[in-house]
């Protein structure tokens, strides 16, 4: 994997150069990035199913599994809310949108219309919960709906526990099948440099560096805030839990580079599951926390939502009282739960938030369209680190973390002596 790390880094640099020098060629490279992500997504659902179902069957204690789920949701809610608050506070202090003086009437609302339409197709809480239940067993896999696959996996695991010896045989088959899919992943990951090259070439070629210059204050504020969140907040949580955030970042550096190139944290989901298990976290915990975190624990997306909303209010001279900002925080706590780890999901979630908060003109989204792709990379990186830390923390709370193995792995030593 060390060679992959270097190759992806070189590919990202080459993608930036091609996109900047030959924009049309850069845009034409988009299928390379899309193809790589599709290959990864091809095996995500079966990997989650086999890992979670097999893990529950091996655990044998349904109460323990429920306990892990409750602890994970508590962690997600606390840290996600903290990320939203930090974005709100930074937006108030730095005021990256001050001085733009943009008249919403002069904006082309049609530019963001597609995102708004997707956001307005959101569902109520009851419909959302019902949507977690797939129409058919195969349908969840065909649609790639990770939460539906997770529901099926949990039911399958519980069924195995109740079936005694036969259930153990099924669990063994699931474990062996997961090895097959991880083998496929190891083959696909070799294509990561090509995918990163194509995706980065498209990003620079399509949107150019001009967008970064025009909205540099917002982009810089978001990147610095996210970096501080990772180092201070997640770093503090990691320290309390007995490991170094810096060593953890070094451990997942290959995955971070792939995410940087593809702007999608979902593109490394299977690899992260494998690495966290290798670091000493119990398989059943990894299988539950990581997939669930991709909908309920997107720290980077949460920071972006409140920070970007305040930026738009400031840029369009829309005053917001403290009460309105607190209302915005409450709405964001709900809409952020519908996000996912795919490229562009954060922008759609932002559109959903603005659709519910009438104070800020929704046409203001057009301001961010050109620069959102660059911010998507930072969102994805922060989301990835956040879910990785969450998994290790929940595993430690549950007594499902091999501390000695984790220390060895983060030091760069073999997992077993």
Swiss-Prot record:
Ranges that cross the membrane: 8-28, 36-56, 70-90, 137-157, 180-200, 226-246, 285-305, 351-371
Q: List the subcellular locations.
A: Cell inner membrane
User: How does the UniProt record describe the way this protein sits in the membrane?
Assistant: Multi-pass membrane protein
- What protein name is recorded for this chain? C4-dicarboxylate transport protein
Entry's family note: Belongs to the dicarboxylate/amino acid:cation symporter (DAACS) (TC 2.A.23) family.
Where this protein primarily resides, as one coarse class?
membrane
| InterPro entries found in the cross-reference section | C4_dicarb_transport, Na-dicarboxylate_symporter, Na-dicarboxylate_symporter_CS, Na:dicarbo_symporter_sf
Q: Give the record's keywords alphabetically.
A: Cell inner membrane, Cell membrane, Membrane, Symport, Transmembrane, Transmembrane helix, Transport
Which GO BP annotation is one of this protein's? Answer: L-aspartate transmembrane transport
- GO cellular component entries: plasma membrane
Instruction: Show the Gene3D superfamilies listed in the entry.
Output: Sodium:dicarboxylate symporter
Q: Name any one Pfam family assigned in the record.
A: SDF
Q: What does the UniProt record say this protein does?
A: Responsible for the transport of dicarboxylates such as succinate, fumarate, and malate from the periplasm across the membrane.
* Signal peptide bounds: none
Please give the PROSITE patterns that the UniProt record associates with this protein. NA_DICARBOXYL_SYMP_1, NA_DICARBOXYL_SYMP_2
Keyword Cell inner membrane among record annotations: yes
Name its species. Caulobacter vibrioides (strain NA1000 / CB15N)
Question: What terms describe the molecular function in GO for this protein?
Answer: fumarate transmembrane transporter activity; malate:proton symporter activity; succinate transmembrane transporter activity
